[in-house]
Amino acid sequence: MTVERTFSIIKPNAVKKNAIGAIYARFESAGFKIIAAKMLHLTREQAEGFYAEHKGRPFFDGLVEFMTSGPIVVQVLEGENAVQRHRDLMGATNPDNALAGTLRADYADSFTENAVHGSDAVESANREIAYFFTEDEICPR
């Protein structure tokens, strides 16, 4: 297997629930190394830029509103087959379809307020990591 990096967001609803530590424990229990992390409150411009590929879709404005509604935690996770393993840990985008024991089954409130984001491919992970982190902020270990 190949060691990969993936990008992850703990979204405002999970931060508000004080679930950061529990989610980090799940990352580490699943074998991920957290090699970069920061908490921030997205501006509208940052959220629109990050989700630019969804502009024009019916859910875009609501997504931007939600993602700017409170602080988020962004992190870079490293591990074998990290992109797919992180997606498996997150569970289905719609929490109603998420398997028990996944992050979305445990922490999501709705399809939009689904607790976490994760990259869908290595290429998008690289782009998303670069959106929030400089190389100097990433600490391989």
UniProtKB/Swiss-Prot annotation:
**Domain of life (superkingdom):** Bacteria
The protein's matches in CDD domains, at most eight in alphabetical order, are given as: NDPk_I (cd04413)
**Protein name as catalogued:** Nucleoside diphosphate kinase
Q: Which residues form the active site?
A: H117
Key word Kinase present: yes
**What positions does the entry give for ATP binding?**
K11, F59, R87, T93, R104, N114
Q: Which NCBIfam families match?
A: PRK00668.1
Reaction(s) the record says it catalyses? a 2'-deoxyribonucleoside 5'-diphosphate + ATP = a 2'-deoxyribonucleoside 5'-triphosphate + ADP; a ribonucleoside 5'-diphosphate + ATP = a ribonucleoside 5'-triphosphate + ADP
Per UniProt, the keywords (alphabetical) are: ATP-binding, Cytoplasm, Kinase, Magnesium, Metal-binding, Nucleotide metabolism, Nucleotide-binding, Phosphoprotein, Transferase
Q: What's an example GO cellular component term for this entry?
A: cytoplasm
SMART domains linked to this entry: NDK
Could you say which cofactors this protein requires? Mg(2+)
> Which GO molecular-function terms appear in the entry?
ATP binding; metal ion binding; nucleoside diphosphate kinase activity
Location (main, coarse): cytoplasm
Under the heading InterPro entries, the entry gives: NDK-like_dom (IPR034907), NDK-like_dom_sf (IPR036850), Nucleoside_diP_kinase (IPR001564), Nucleoside_diP_kinase_AS (IPR023005)
Presence of the UniProt keyword Cytoplasm in the record: yes
HAMAP family reported for this sequence: NDP_kinase
PROSITE patterns reported in the protein's UniProt record: NDPK, NDPK_LIKE
Q: Where in the cell is it found?
A: Cytoplasm
* Known function: Major role in the synthesis of nucleoside triphosphates other than ATP. The ATP gamma phosphate is transferred to the NDP beta phosphate via a ping-pong mechanism, using a phosphorylated active-site intermediate.
Gene designation: ndk
| EC numbers on record | 2.7.4.6
A Pfam family per the record: NDK
Protein family membership: Belongs to the NDK family.
**Subunit annotation:** Homotetramer.
GO BP terms: CTP biosynthetic process; GTP biosynthetic process; UTP biosynthetic process
